């Protein structure tokens, strides 16, 4: 389900948070489109935190600390990286107004970024919205192999450590399925979201201003509760 809003300049970060609490998020047709439209998918993408999968090859890359991973250090650069054309994704849904809104959410502590660096160059990352015990992954990018995957592993470790209950990916791609992403019907999603919004989580339970090693991130993921059957 979608609904177009031509008065996107009237939307505030606080209004955006209320939309997320209702299971709705904004997109744009293209970077040049001045308007937004609201989306509430019939089937919602999630990565169950207790079912997150890390391949052996990726685990070796994460453990090697070949990349330096930081948090909330270069938010604007990450959102710009996500908005830039990439192979297989020549266009973007991140227009100027979306950029402004999410920077606004970052400034009030409800949006976060994970940055991946190689030799002091930003080569990957992701950003998303934090509300209650829910984290809404918005977009990711990479300029080096596995950089966005490493960012996702570090994000999941941080969410687990911080007491999050829901990782919303909005949609499911083959890439996300390899990490355990699933689709759930809208009604089921709303039940999960409502439960996640009853309490608060701590994105900064792991330090924001100090590095977390790949080995530490993998240990946190390995220690998560066993999925219920």
Swiss-Prot record:
<dbReference type="GO" id="GO:0030163">
    <property type="term" value="P:protein catabolic process"/>
</dbReference>
<protein>
    <recommendedName>
        <fullName>Leucyl/phenylalanyl-tRNA--protein transferase</fullName>
        <ecNumber>2.3.2.6</ecNumber>
    </recommendedName>
</protein>
<dbReference type="InterPro" id="IPR042221">
    <property type="entry name" value="Leu/Phe-tRNA_Trfase_N"/>
</dbReference>
<keyword id="KW-0808">Transferase</keyword>
<dbReference type="GO" id="GO:0008914">
    <property type="term" value="F:leucyl-tRNA--protein transferase activity"/>
</dbReference>
<comment type="similarity">
    <text>Belongs to the L/F-transferase family.</text>
</comment>
<keyword id="KW-0963">Cytoplasm</keyword>
<keyword id="KW-0012">Acyltransferase</keyword>
<dbReference type="InterPro" id="IPR042203">
    <property type="entry name" value="Leu/Phe-tRNA_Trfase_C"/>
</dbReference>
<dbReference type="GO" id="GO:0005737">
    <property type="term" value="C:cytoplasm"/>
</dbReference>
<dbReference type="Pfam" id="PF03588">
    <property type="entry name" value="Leu_Phe_trans"/>
</dbReference>
<comment type="function">
    <text>Functions in the N-end rule pathway of protein degradation where it conjugates Leu, Phe and, less efficiently, Met from aminoacyl-tRNAs to the N-termini of proteins containing an N-terminal arginine or lysine.</text>
</comment>
<dbReference type="InterPro" id="IPR016181">
    <property type="entry name" value="Acyl_CoA_acyltransferase"/>
</dbReference>
<dbReference type="InterPro" id="IPR004616">
    <property type="entry name" value="Leu/Phe-tRNA_Trfase"/>
</dbReference>
